[in-house]
Amino acid sequence: MRPSDDHGETSEFLPITRSRSVSAASQTSTDSSLSTESLFPGEQKPFPNVNGTMALADDDQYRDLEDGEVEQTEPFLASSKKAATGGGRARRIFWILVLLCLGGWLLAFALFLTGGRANYQTASDALQAHGADSALGSTSTSSGKPVTLQQVLAGQWNPRYHAIGWVAGPNNEDGLLVEKGGDEKQGYLRVDDIRSRKGNDTGRESRVLMWKPIVHVDGKAIVPSNVWPSPDLKKVLLISEQQKNWRHSFTGKYWVLDVDSQTAQPLDPSAPDGRVQLALWSPASDAVVFVRDNNLYLRRLSSDSVVVITKDGGENLFYGVPDWVYEEEVISGNSVTWWSNDAKYIAFFRTNETSVPEFPVQYYISRPSGKKPLPGLENYPDVREIKYPKPGAPNPVVDLQFYDVDKNEVFSVEVADDFADDDRIIIEVLWASEGKVLVRSTNRESDILKVYLIDTKSRTGKLVRSEDVAGLDGGWVEPSQSTRFIPADPNNGRPHDGYIDTVPYNGYDHLAYFSPLDSPNALMLTSGEWEVVDAPAAVDLQRGLVYFVGTREAPTQRHVYRVQLDGSNLKPLTDTSKPGYYDVSFSHGTGYALLTYKGPSIPWQAIIKTQGDEITYEDRIEDNAQLTKMVEAYALPTEIYQNVTVDGYTLQLVERRPPHFNPAKKYPVLFYLYGGPGSQTVDRKFTVDFQSYVASSLGYIVVTVDGRGTGFIGRKARCIVRGNLGFYEAHDQIATAKMWAAKSYVDETRMAIWGWSFGGFMTLKTLEQDAGQTFQYGMAVAPVTDWRFYDSIYTERYMHTPQHNPSGYDNSTITDMAALSESVRFLVMHGASDDNVHLQNTLVLIDKLDLSNVENYDLQFYPDSDHSIYFHNAHTMVYDRLSDWLVNAFNGEWHLIAKPVPDESMWERMKRSLPLLYP
């Protein structure tokens, strides 16, 4: 399960531009801390009891008629002749009375409308005055237009980022990068030397790999959607007609372009229209391994024929590509194929899904299967059967196999002390030298790690390291693919091969160096009450430097550091004197890097040159000038970063206050969360998202707190949630909300919480645990409601199997419908074709609500939408609904419809008001 990419960053190949000036964002950002020890709840003020009916006097003329009853009235016009002669005057009196009654009724109706809503302020208007709370920093003085939801959804607030493709030169030259998107004079696809861009004579000239963005094959125009140059830069692999499969996987038609002749041919000349799932260059640039119909093939460029590596792949057997659950929860990618460094071997997964149960996903509008229905069957939904293992059900059986390129032979290596087939998850494969490969595996519940060393030449293997993480701190092993091989170099003090891994150390995740490869003992490179992130980023083998990103300054920040390979002389490379959030991508030889500053001010990117302890800025390639202009023109919320202490744990929090915040007023508060294990929502990246829109345009306060279970606050706080998802996380949200409810500028009668995916689960779990005491409203999108319904690999990592932890699954399930009924109202939305968090979750919840006679909720489904809810304008609609629903909640509308009472029509009231009108 991954957080929804609601405000995803753009990352694209763009022509690199020269340096431009950049100004800081005008968002105000301050820091403070708050503890439960200083919490003094204020006087509780009950919400006005309004049910939407008009208070009427106990008078017969206003009572409702029983069914079939007719009121008796005297005739208005007498039958006598005397009465007839005075008809004109009587008519005038009649119409005067009618107009007076009608006017009185309209006045009463208007008073009802205004009076019934007088206690429900809209946005930040009509807020009650209270004393200011100045403990949390300054208020916003930014001016300008409010942020619009349309801007957020259209990505207008997304920073512009460049993804540079660093490549090694044919002779292992450093500082070369691939650029895509130039004009015909520059060439569409080029390899540039960063030194040449700065006018350095030592730089290589730019080399054009593709002159035009379109190539022709047998008279057919091929428009590639992505490109991959060969390591020797003499060929380019192209993909066209790309189609998405799952989150990371896709298929397409592949082509090989010759750089010198600018001509292309199909990857498989015998099947040019075949759809390929994966294609990877050989390190020797002389071959491409690819997957089609779940089988592996090898195309040597010296021949037009292809070599069949596997033959039995199909519906239940996958070779070289992951199945759904491995793609989503283990690899986070579309490839489980790895070339050895010398191009002599290929390692790949064989995934057997035969025993995995299927789950049907229905599509009512589209037909993603691509199959045309038979005549007469057009009105039936397209059904996609997914092999989806749920907790306790059979998992796919994954084996590591190898292919000897020269011998054209597939083989496996048996290893003693390996996990059983039904208890093995392979999380990483890393080639070393001389045909050796490191394999990291865990048991099914992901709390025992085993590292194996396999020798493909001798076809032997052994266990070299084992860690009982559950016994260490009750935690789990998070899958990652960041382990780095360190080759031996006696001249630089490395007599043996080794590798750098991330391991738990004194309660935090840190870098450890293992050498030789079969050593179980590590040299710790980092330590302290902070953590490394997806490390190492790069290793300078000549100078013995390890570069990495870490949270040493604060959990919400990311800075770039370097440390010697012996663990000494750790230093930051980025400016740590002020808050910052950086990312980095190093060149092949680590002499250069793309440094990306993501916040809190306006993001920028620069090419830097590394010189050991120092960095030199070579070229500013992006300063997001357009974003700077928008920041100056719009009123952004004030962001206040704080620490809160709950049960002795220090948690990270950000409060977004509306522009022109007035501490003398009372504001509604929306809590936003994700909260999944190891995740992080509170960080220092520049972000203008839905929460920013809520604060800027709607005038509400938005609070986000990363509770226990989230990442980068230490393993003690993270691992406590294992086996009981939702309990501590919800407790932390409620405890923090009580702190905010006690603040002088918060309207404690108007507090809501919302989230998507795991955040949707957390919204419902918080409402359930809170039972209306703190939060009155909630909005849950695509929520898990019972962890038995989610996939096995993710769930069992944090919950064990249902067989081992039945009570934990019972406790984490949304079951207390009476508690949910105590909130004023909540909203649930779900994509009907969600392949990740199945619609089953919401449907079972609705059944429980029905059985408990609970009606205080709204429900919305989106046909054919998956977990991201995008199909047919659904993404816009889901956020429109969130916005409107929230406004109605804080306006008090859901109180008005809580207990509906029939209301008389205007005509019926008029008739009883003037009984003489009707004989």
Swiss-Prot record:
Region (Disordered) residue spans: 1-50
Domain of life: Eukaryota
Name of this chain's protein: Probable dipeptidyl-aminopeptidase B
Main localization (coarse): membrane
Any single Gene Ontology cellular-component annotation: fungal-type vacuole membrane
Location of this chain's protein in the cell: Vacuole membrane
InterPro entries given in the database record: AB_hydrolase_fold, Peptidase_S9_cat, Peptidase_S9B_N, Serine_Prot_S9B/DPPIV
Vacuolar side: 114-919
EC supergroup of this enzyme: hydrolase
Keyword line: Aminopeptidase, Glycoprotein, Hydrolase, Membrane, Protease, Serine protease, Signal-anchor, Transmembrane, Transmembrane helix, Vacuole
Pfam families: DPPIV_N (PF00930), Peptidase_S9 (PF00326)
The keyword Hydrolase is assigned to this record: yes
GO biological process: proteolysis
Reactions that this protein is recorded to catalyse: Release of an N-terminal dipeptide, Xaa-Yaa-|-Zaa-, from a polypeptide, preferentially when Yaa is Pro, provided Zaa is neither Pro nor hydroxyproline
Bias (Basic and acidic residues): 1-10
Function: Type IV dipeptidyl-peptidase which removes N-terminal dipeptides sequentially from polypeptides having unsubstituted N-termini provided that the penultimate residue is proline.
Low complexity bias: start-end ranges: 21-38
Annotated active site: 757 (charge relay system), 834 (charge relay system), 867 (charge relay system)
Glycosylation sites: 200, 352, 643, 811
Bilayer topology term: Single-pass type II membrane protein
Segments in the Cytoplasmic topological domain: 1-92
Entry GO MF terms: aminopeptidase activity; dipeptidyl-peptidase activity; serine-type peptidase activity
